[in-house]
UniProtKB/Swiss-Prot annotation:
Function according to Swiss-Prot or TrEMBL: Required for rescue of stalled ribosomes mediated by trans-translation. Binds to transfer-messenger RNA (tmRNA), required for stable association of tmRNA with ribosomes. tmRNA and SmpB together mimic tRNA shape, replacing the anticodon stem-loop with SmpB. tmRNA is encoded by the ssrA gene; the 2 termini fold to resemble tRNA(Ala) and it encodes a 'tag peptide', a short internal open reading frame. During trans-translation Ala-aminoacylated tmRNA acts like a tRNA, entering the A-site of stalled ribosomes, displacing the stalled mRNA.
Keywords: Cytoplasm, RNA-binding
Cellular localization per UniProt: Cytoplasm
Main location: cytoplasm
Any Pfam family the entry gives: SmpB
Biological process (GO), any one: trans-translation
GO cellular component, one term: cytosol
Protein name listed in UniProt: SsrA-binding protein
Length: 166
């Protein structure tokens, strides 16, 4: 019986490691109102995988487009792998293909026809041994929307702290 307890803990630890967050675009949720999300695969080179696992990815200026029926990730900087030479390293800002089902891409294309919507990379994470990218369908926020959202969050924080004091 004692062996089963250790196995369960090890399995839980393994599951947590399998869902590890590798890069996050925190500013995206501030600048955009996220209406829908989609988890996609990402086509990477070997040195890109090693660099992402080392935490060398920057999603801040990234965006996604649908070109020729394929999802593409643009303007995401993945730094070169330190152990690789310049000859074997990848180009940091290259266009990367995203892997999604045709029906998901068609659904996104239909939603993107609405004016003002865009696809933004939200985070890169591990799912098992696969690197996945979560993209969000977002609508840009105006300055007053950002202020209103900050005010709402501050009010909720104040309310929670007031309830704790009671």
């Amino acid at each position: 019986m004692a062996g089963k307890g250790k196995g369960a803990k090890a399995a839980a630890k393994k599951r947590l490691e399998a869902q590890k967050l590798l890069a996050d675009n925190r500013q995206a949720r501030h600048q955009y109102e996220i209406l829908d999300t989609l988890e996609t695969g990402i086509e990477l080179l070997g040195t890109e995988v090693k660099a992402i696992r080392a935490g060398k990815a920057n999603l801040r200026d990234g965006f996604c487009l649908i070109r020729q029926g394929q999802l593409q990730l643009h303007n995401v900087h993945i730094a070169g792998h330190e152990q690789a030479s310049r000859y074997f390293n990848h180009e940091p800002l290259r266009v990367r293909r995203l892997l999604a089902h045709r029906r998901e891409i068609d659904k996104l294309r239909g939603q993107l026809d609405t004016k003002g919507l865009t696809l933004i990379p939200l985070n890169i994470h591990l799912k098992g041994s696969w690197i996945k990218l979560t993209i969000g369908l977002g609508k840009g926020r105006k300055l007053h929307d950002k202020r209103q959202e900050e005010r709402r969050k501050q009010d909720q924080k104040d309310l929670r702290s007031a309830l704790k004091r009671l």
